[in-house]
Amino acid sequence: MDIKKLPKEIIEGRRLKREEDLRFFATANLEELCQGADNIRKVLCGDAVNLCSIINGKSGKCSENCKFCAQSSHHHTGIEEYSFLDTNLIVEDCKKHANKGVHRYSIVTAGRELKGKDLQVACDAYKRMKEECDIDLCASHGLLSEEAFIALKESGVSMYHENIETSKRNFPNICTTHTYKDKINAIKLAQRLGFKVCSGGIIGMGETFEDRLDMAVSLAELKIQSIPINTLMPIKGTTYEDLEPLTEDEILRTVAMFRFINPTANIRLAAGRSLMEDSGRRAFHAGANATITGDLLTTSGNNIDKDKEMLTQMGFHL
């Protein structure tokens, strides 16, 4: 494919499909690739940037064995473990982020599935945030039942987050306590019940570039419109503690590729921005138009005010 002509074709309506040979993304000139992705973003998405923030609502002791995760009970990382946070604390944190201009706020909890008392506590918190905070609500609570999804919906949650993490082929290499199909089923159930879905994955876990391509295409097939791209920051005590972090060029190539394959989605920089110069500034000229701002789950994130200042200087509208 001609990387110089492809952006115009995508802007005019072409969509890249699984059956096409997309391996050229791995070797295309990086500057041309990023410029093309930026042009697609400008025309199809405009200059609006979407900011979201999260709070780690319930930390550690997770039954699942995801090799990248500091919260898995299969790892010994020394992270702080605690049961569900107090509702007042969550609501006050949400207000703080809303007042800073963040667009969406999510409680994220460790564990395969939120249920029982913890689900009720979460729903109570979402109801209060819906009433007291001027912000859209997202939730990230694992592989939920239909009843749990409905409870969240009735509590004011409009978006659900469930990463597919990697390609279908590679998924068994990173987790064996649940399956790729479990993830897809949860996403489709959330969509059927009327949720917008935020879903992406993690790069830098030893996967091939073809795995990243497959993940990008799978998300396009699922019609996902918010795609977080996390770059692995190896955490001591996890299976992946000794993996070499990706270079900035590798991250930029992946971000740009995701924009070509998901041209109208919010491509959201998530964990790993610190691996890039100036908090990933170049990635916002390579197709990204959204980010998680503030602290993350078990790693420090980016300062909200500094993010807003940088993005405004770059010509984005908040």
Swiss-Prot record:
It catalyses: (4R,5S)-dethiobiotin + (sulfur carrier)-SH + 2 reduced [2Fe-2S]-[ferredoxin] + 2 S-adenosyl-L-methionine = (sulfur carrier)-H + biotin + 2 5'-deoxyadenosine + 2 L-methionine + 2 oxidized [2Fe-2S]-[ferredoxin]. It comes from the Bacteria. Its cofactor is [4Fe-4S] cluster; [2Fe-2S] cluster. CDD domains: Radical_SAM. Binds 1 [4Fe-4S] cluster. The cluster is coordinated with 3 cysteines and an exchangeable S-adenosyl-L-methionine. GO terms for biological process: biotin biosynthetic process. [2Fe-2S] cluster binds at residues 106, 138, 198, 268. Its EC number is 2.8.1.6. [4Fe-4S] cluster binds at residues 62, 66, 69. It holds the Pfam family BATS. Keywords: 2Fe-2S, 4Fe-4S, Biotin biosynthesis, Iron, Iron-sulfur, Metal-binding, S-adenosyl-L-methionine, Transferase. Homodimer. Catalyzes the conversion of dethiobiotin (DTB) to biotin by the insertion of a sulfur atom into dethiobiotin via a radical-based mechanism. This is Biotin synthase. It comes from Alkaliphilus metalliredigens (strain QYMF).
